[in-house]
Amino acid sequence: MISYNDTIAAIATAMSDSGIGIIRISGDDAISIADKIFKSKNHDKKLINVKSHTVHYGYINDDDKFLDEVIVIVMKAPHSYTTENTIEINCHGGVLMVNRILETVIKHGARLAEPGEFTKRAFLNGRIDLSKAEAVIDIIHSKNEFALQAGTAQLKGSVSNEVIDMREQILYEIAFIESALDDPEHISLDGFKERISNTAEHLVARISKLIDSSQNGKILKEGINTVILGKPNAGKSSLMNILVGEEKAIVTSIAGTTRDILEENIKLHGIGLNVIDTAGIRETEDIVEKIGVEKALKYAEKADLVIFVVDSSVPLNESDFAIMDFMKTKKSIILLNKADLITVVSEETLKKYLAQYVGQSAENIPIIKTSTKENIGIDIFEEQIKEMFFNGEISFSDQIYITNMRHKEALEDAKKSLLMVQKSIEDDMPEDFLSIDLMSAYASLGTIIGEEVGEDLVNEIFSKFCMGK
């Protein structure tokens, strides 16, 4: 059983040949341990006697053996990341040196920290709630600009503040019902059901908005899973190369050059695109190419976005129609490619077949004339993706994005309980029923900020962190 009252240490920087390495120490004995191995330029200085949030130059010694020239930062409790006494030793980088200093710190009384234990202590000591702790790992793992912004917004309290406010409203109603039931002579329940119903309705609307944001929140965090489809030699690989910014796919005039799946993570106006270039969709006897076609359709089924590249220089055929039929249930963009050549497929022709194979939703599918060879229309295509998923605007000032599936599930549970409150009022059920469902909603929202969670869940969340954080 791990104790959270001892002193821990870990390397807080990447294990590489970097210019600087940082060893972090936290706990009651952090400063006294540092004093055992740190010698300031002024040998009389002891870190235990210095002011908090001060920086000190000196040396790290191990049994009077010089190890490195360092800068030490002292942060005294409770004004630190963990709220505990904290020391950060800034030494020269390099795996060997950083590890040697860490070993010396452990030798003099610290324990090697578990992954995420510094942030876990910040949570257990009440400095941050659980949603803010989860934001830390989201920031660390951010793959694009908007994922980073979503993480920092959550760390600043965008989710926490919303949850706390809703819980306060629920708690007010619970307290009123309980007080009225305990003292019916002095507290009247007359007309209270209408007020509680209005409160529940208002909260359901707020929670529904948060739940609805989770789809875009997932995309901000993980990126848009995008599949490029089209028949062979339509220009799919050329499009992939333009998006990536270098030649990842082989481009030739020979149909069927791409026979397997190519995957790339691309940043597009701050949004992440997980792009998959697929084998051209066509009937083929080539076993390898056939497997590639089957893979293409399998990936397309799971995609958030299908990009259908149409070769406008040749007539449409059954391969094109098969892709159109597949697009009925998918967000899609059509690129009418090879606009630099003599075209035989017009936008009007394409719309006619789309209406036949896709139905009414065909009107919502953008058609953009492009030339991947001449880089024509690609800027319009990129803007269209942003418009399609975020109405052209991604704002963190007036919009909260739920990026965590655990939070979404908790919100859904709270919404169900509040809907039960409304139903109980409609059915004229006893007041006890209202109180039970309100308490259930209160508890569900509490799991988001860590007030109603078990040790196993807390351990699972922090196990995903890296060492030293």
Region spans (language model):
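Glycine-rich phosphate-binding loop used to anchor ATP phosphates in small-molecule kinases
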Residues: 60, 197, 306-317
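Generic enzyme active-site microenvironment
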Residues: 275, 309, 335
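Switch I (G2) and immediately adjacent beta-strands of P-loop GTPase domains
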Residues: 56-67, 72-76, 256-284, 302-305
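A glycine-rich (often HGG/GG-containing) alpha/beta subdomain
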Residues: 1-149, 153, 157, 333
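Glycine-rich, N-terminal phosphate-binding loop of Rossmann-like dinucleotide-binding domains
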Residues: 93, 243, 278, 310-313, ...
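Inter-motif core of Ras-like GTPase G domains
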Residues: 289-313
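Conserved beta-strand segments of alpha/beta enzyme cores
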Residues: 111, 272-274, 366
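C-terminal-of-GTPase-core extension/linker across diverse P-loop GTPases
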Residues: 2-11, 15-18, 145-267, 284, ...
